[in-house]
Amino acid sequence: GQDTLPPTVKTMPSIVGVWENYKLYLSRGNELAQWHRNVPSYFTFDDHELVNDIWGSAEIGKRHRRTVFRDIGTRAWFDYLGWANPVEHPRRVHAARGKMTAGSKLLVDSSTDFTKLPIDRMGTLHVHWDTPEAGVNNLKFDNDDGHKNSYVYQITKVIDAHTLELHMPAKVSDEVTYSIGRSSFGKFRVANCEFFLLDTRGSRDLHDVANRGKEG
């Protein structure tokens, strides 16, 4: 048997629920399983594949339970569906634990060498909600009960191998679960046709319904 939890589960325990959803849907969908056994397929995800109604996952400073679930949902999606997709940047979601200090913009993680991560080709940094209901698709959990440092952050500078500077200071001093998003887009070619697989959620700003011409 398994004596210890895999690192992914230790860092992002909510991912187990997402994995179980994929297993459940496939076990119940006999026709779907038959299709996949016989037809090669490509997939791309929208918010419903991560947790319903994710918006603003790249909106700097945004705080919302669903928004900061992006990387957990994306990692699980690649485990079950996206693993076969051609991608421009194969680097996975980076998820780990780090220390933040109230009033400081620095995030310190002694287990990660940030100089070896392609930060310029990765997404925004999320500090996770860290509640048992973080990935539950139920409006009653859309409250403010998550970790006080749980926001969408822009990485402004790699200070050294184990330290990042973020765009805004932490609210409280604590060890947090954080992740840095991946680039999930790709393309492939068949004869003279080129097909583009888009990532419509991973790097999306929050739309402004009052200013529909706003860039971003």
Predicted regions and their residues:
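Intrinsically disordered, low-complexity acidic/polar segments
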Residues: 116, 205-207
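Short, surface-exposed beta-strand/loop micro-motifs that present aromatic residues
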Residues: 183-189
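Active-site neighborhood of divalent metal-dependent phosphoester/pyrophosphate hydrolases
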Residues: 1-103, 162-171, 192-205
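Cys-His-centered catalytic/binding microenvironment captured across papain-like cysteine peptidases
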Residues: 174-180
